[in-house]
Regions:
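Helix-loop-helix "hairpin" substructures at the membrane interface of multi-pass membrane proteins
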Residues: 121-178
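Membrane-interfacial amphipathic/re-entrant helices at transmembrane-helix boundaries
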Residues: 1-10
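Short amphipathic alpha-helical coupling elements at transmembrane boundaries
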Residues: 68, 72, 111-118, 154-158
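Short loop segments and helix-boundary regions at transmembrane helix junctions
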Residues: 17-103
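Transmembrane helix-bundle core of multi-pass membrane transporters
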Residues: 82, 86-140
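Short juxtamembrane and helix-loop transition motifs at transmembrane-helix boundaries
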Residues: 13-22, 40-51, 147-158, 172-178
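Membrane-embedded alpha-helical core segments of multi-pass
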Residues: 11-12, 19, 62-66, 89-93, ...
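Alpha-helical transmembrane segments of integral membrane proteins
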Residues: 3-4, 51, 55, 59, ...
Length: 178
């Protein structure tokens, strides 16, 4: 538990500040709930029900990227889009979990859906270490540009920062962390 806290704590602190600044708290909550659908899809596709991480990460990253893409193409508010996509994802995930529960014990999925830092296993720690390393390598070259784009997007554009690219990178980082 201490290893997990030491790995993820500094990343959450730094990224959390930008999440609040960009008013994306609802987005991170939506990604967390969309994970249910990723888990159900993974179990349906044959991943082990104790660790359907590939489908979980894939679904959540696609979920975040689609929301961001749609936000950039419409004039709807972010919260409206997030609410719509969240509702669709939860409905799909709930339906798939009902179908999946006939094949596996639904209580076995609870440890993934409602995890606790006190009940992490070796696989969770390996996934966390790999995620932290990847996020660290992505953050180092982009951190200053992310901070500038978070606090003052207009200044970032004037300074030549590709704000859209930074936004997509930030979405992926928040999605993986969540």
């Amino acid at each position: 538990a201490m290893i997990c806290a030491l790995l993820i704590g500094p990343i959450l602190g730094g990224i959390g500040t930008m999440v609040v600044t960009k008013k994306m708290a609802f987005f991170s909550e939506a990604v967390g709930h969309a994970a249910m659908t990723g888990i159900a899809v993974g179990v349906l596709l044959g991943e082990p029900f104790s660790a359907p991480y590939i489908s979980l990460f894939t679904y959540c990253i696609l979920f975040g990227l689609i929301i961001n893409y749609t936000k950039n193409r419409t004039k709807m508010s972010s919260d409206t889009l997030i609410g719509v996509f969240l509702s669709i994802s939860i409905a799909l995930g709930g339906s798939l979990l009902i179908y999946v529960s006939a094949k596996v014990n639904s209580h076995a999925l609870e440890s993934i859906l409602f995890g606790s830092i006190l009940t992490v296993n070796d696989t969770d720690i390996y996934i966390l270490v790999v995620s932290a390393i990847i996020i660290g390598f992505v953050l180092v070259p982009y951190l200053n540009r992310m901070l500038l784009a978070s606090f003052n997007p207009n200044l970032a554009i004037v300074r030549g920062v590709n704000v859209k690219l930074i936004e997509y990178i930030f979405i992926i980082i928040v999605t993986v962390i969540t």
